[in-house]
Amino acid sequence: MARYLVLAVALLLAACSSTQKKPLADDPFYAPVYPEAPPTKIAATGSIYQDSQASSLYSDIRAHKVGDIITIVLKESTQAKKSAGNQIKKGSDMSLDPIFAGGSNISVGGVPIDLRYKDSMNTKRESDADQSNSLDGSISANVMQVLNNGSLVIRGEKWISINNGDEFIRVTGLVRSQDIKPDNTIDSTRMANARIQYSGTGTFADAQKVGWLSQFFMSDWWPF
């Protein structure tokens, strides 16, 4: 019996344990892509000026090729509210009048046969859920790929070390070149297939985690 109890406890601990890996600051998935350096051309006239390295005061500075940097303005705000309720009523009423036979009531042991039964049930349940989140800030990302239609696949991360922990923001998504503003910024609400992650690691982040025993009581494994 003790052997089965130890096995059951081990299974519960294994189920409650978290296998999620901690994020790393040098994740290769978010590594920047650098544009290839153009071949150096020697001017035939001996002049220092070269057309390949020239830029105009009126040129477009918006990101449009692999390796360019674009600033994403985070303007995320979500709010969800849900309420549900149900009420179930059920009742039954049954009666059996005394049975007459031969001009008198039929009785058992001198007690007339008479039955009265009444039952009722009323169940009412209500639930409310309200959740809201907001995220403001900015992060610069790298253009990882340019699609055939001109859309840009962008990806980037920002790590900030504060006291005993690190905070990070990771962004990946798809943007249209037309939605990029003249100052080379774009709102996060204009990103398609956006993945925005804001979290942290260290002492403060660990303090916000729920312990394994509390996770068990709040999980589907708890029978009550």
Curated annotation (Swiss-Prot):
Principal place of residence: membrane
GO biological process, one term: bacterial-type flagellum-dependent cell motility
Compartments (UniProt record): Cell outer membrane; Bacterial flagellum basal body
Residue ranges that the Swiss-Prot or TrEMBL entry lists as coiled coil: none
Keyword terms of this UniProt record: Bacterial flagellum, Cell outer membrane, Lipoprotein, Membrane, Palmitate, Signal
Gene Ontology cellular-component annotations: bacterial-type flagellum basal body, distal rod, L ring; cell outer membrane
Positions of N-palmitoyl cysteine lipidation: C16
Extent of the signal sequence: 1-15
Matches recorded under InterPro entries: Flag_Lring
Bilayer topology: Lipid-anchor
PROSITE patterns: PROKAR_LIPOPROTEIN
Lipid-binding residues (covalent, S-diacylglycerol cysteine): C16
A GO term, aspect molecular function: cytoskeletal motor activity
Domain of life: Bacteria
Alphabetical list of HAMAP family matching this protein: FlgH
NCBIfam families named among the record's database cross-references: PRK00249.1-4, PRK12698.1
Role description: Assembles around the rod to form the L-ring and probably protects the motor/basal body from shearing forces during rotation.
Family to which the UniProt record says this protein belongs: Belongs to the FlgH family.
Subunit structure: The basal body constitutes a major portion of the flagellar organelle and consists of four rings (L,P,S, and M) mounted on a central rod.
Designated name of the protein: Flagellar L-ring protein
Gene it is expressed from: flgH
